[in-house]
């Protein structure tokens, strides 16, 4: 039993007892762990700022027999741009949920810089594109990265061609089946050449260059669907945050349409009869 310091990203927080919170943390030093923040729900608690979800904090923890306790919490970065934007916040929460679901306790320290970078990118770049980059690189770090270059059947390189049949992609198998072997896998879905090219690029590029990419919404939806299906096969289910992101997207799309309809209705009502 001892005190130790840790850099932590707060993945999740839930009420515990009358005034405490149980935190799920991703630490640079020890990976993912759970800790209790006692009295943090009281308005006067000094732990409040450093234990909020989606916060990068410097913590002092007491290592007990069964549960670790946060004794000090100082925020390093609160990511105001994420908390102030519902779309960015939804994507940041989804990243945290993915790390929580896919990494076991007391492991995943190598995911700390990936998630921290992801939250920084979300503060600047479009959420859907950052989410795709993060999901692919998370799969890669966890050893689940799909095979994007070679045919899983024969091992031959899969070329990207603007014309001709598309290669097949299997989330269950974890990658591509080229045209040379596709006849043996008629049940597989197909992947667009542009989507395959984007996935390869996202895996290799410098994340700081994300703003230079010009990706249409249709292609981005295709890539997102490929990654989500791959994650479902590894996590045995959906992420709850995905439905939140879809709901937020629908509401933002519908709002301008409703305003336009309301404006037209107002104009119609003002016309002389």
Curated annotation (Swiss-Prot):
Biased region (Basic and acidic residues) positions are 252-273
Report the transmembrane regions from the record. Answer: none
Q: Which GO terms describe its cellular component?
A: bacterial nucleoid
**BP GO annotations:** DNA recombination; double-strand break repair
- Keyword set includes Transmembrane helix: no
Which residues lie within the region annotated Disordered?
A: 249-273
Keyword set, alphabetical order: DNA damage, DNA recombination, DNA repair
Q: InterPro entries recorded for this chain?
A: ARFGAP/RecO, DNA_rep/recomb_RecO_N, NA-bd_OB-fold, RecO, RecO_C
Role description: Involved in DNA repair and RecF pathway recombination.
Question: What NCBIfam families would the database entry show?
Answer: reco
Entry similarity comment: Belongs to the RecO family.
What is this protein's name? DNA repair protein RecO
Q: Cite the source lineage.
A: Bacteria, Bacillati, Bacillota, Clostridia, Eubacteriales
């Amino acid at each position: 039993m001892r005190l130790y310091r840790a850099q932590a990203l707060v993945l999740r927080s839930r009420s515990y007892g009358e005034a405490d919170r149980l935190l799920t943390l991703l630490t640079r030093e020890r990976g993912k762990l759970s800790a209790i923040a006692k009295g943090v729900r009281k308005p006067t608690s000094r732990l409040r700022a450093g234990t909020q979800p989606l916060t990068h904090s410097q913590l002092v923890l007491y290592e007990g027999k069964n549960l670790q306790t946060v004794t000090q919490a100082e925020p390093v970065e609160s990511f105001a741009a994420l908390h102030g934007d519902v779309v960015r916040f939804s994507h940041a929460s989804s990243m945290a949920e993915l790390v929580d679901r896919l990494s076991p306790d007391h492991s995943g320290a190598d995911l700390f810089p990936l998630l921290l970078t992801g939250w920084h990118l979300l503060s600047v770049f479009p959420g859907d594109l950052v989410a795709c980059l993060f999901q692919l690189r998370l799969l890669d770090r966890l050893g689940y990265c799909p095979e994007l270059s070679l045919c899983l059947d024969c091992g031959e390189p899969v070329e990207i061609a603007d014309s001709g049949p598309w290669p097949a992609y299997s989330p269950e198998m974890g990658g591509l089946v080229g045209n040379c072997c596709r006849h043996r896998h008629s049940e597989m879905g197909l992947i667009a050449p542009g989507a395959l090219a984007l996935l390869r690029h996202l895996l290799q590029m410098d994340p700081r260059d994300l703003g230079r990419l010009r990706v249409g919404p249709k292609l981005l939806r295709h890539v997102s669907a490929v990654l989500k299906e791959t994650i479902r096969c590894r996590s045995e289910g959906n992420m709850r945050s995905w439905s939140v992101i879809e709901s937020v997207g629908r509401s933002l799309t519908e709002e301008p349409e409703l305003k336009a309809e309301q404006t037209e209705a107002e104009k119609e009502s003002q016309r002389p009869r």
